[in-house]
C-alpha cells in the first residue's frame, strides 16, 4: 500500500505536446472557463492539464501568437480582453464569412447531413435545459462546426471557424438572456428547415440573425423565399 501511494505521488505529468495543451486551453477559454482578462499561471496550467512545464510554456506562447492570450513580462499570461468595439467588428466578420459558406452548404448537404444536424440541434436543446456552461458551449459549437464544414471551400471553412473561435463564448457574452438561448435553439431548427428546402436566401438570413442576435429577431425571421 505504501509503495503504491509512493508510486502515485511520484507520477510525473504527461508530455502531451504543446499543441494538445494549447487546444485544451483554447477550448476552455471559448467555453467561458477562463473569462476576459483571467490570469493563466503556468503552475496552474501544469496541474489542470497534467502536462509538463515545457508544454505549458510552449502552449501559452502559441496562444499568445494567435492573440488568444497576452503576455506581460515578469508577470505572465492573461486571456485577451475583447472590448465592445472589437466584439462588434468580429460579429460582422462572422456574418460575412458564414453567410458566404451557405451556397456551398446547400449544394453539398445530403439527407444524412441534415439528419445529423437535427441530432446536434436536439443535443443543444437538451443542454440549455439541463447542461452547464461547458455543455452548452460544446453542443452549440458541435452544431455550427458540422454545418460550416459542409461547405466545400476548405479555406473559407477554416477562416469562419477561426473567427468564431476569437469570440468569447460564456453564456453572458454569447447569449443576453435565457430567452435568447432558447431563441438560438429555435433558430438551429429553422436553419435546418431552410437547408432541407434548399433555400439559400432564407438560410443566409437566418445565419445573419443568429450571429447578430437583433432585439427584434422575431420580426426578422421571414417565411420561405423559395
Predicted features along the sequence, with ranges:
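Short helix-capping and inter-helix turn/linker motifs at the boundaries of alpha-helical repeat units
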Residues: 16, 114-115, 179-182
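Short alpha-helical transmembrane interface motifs in multi-pass membrane proteins
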Residues: 83-84, 170-174
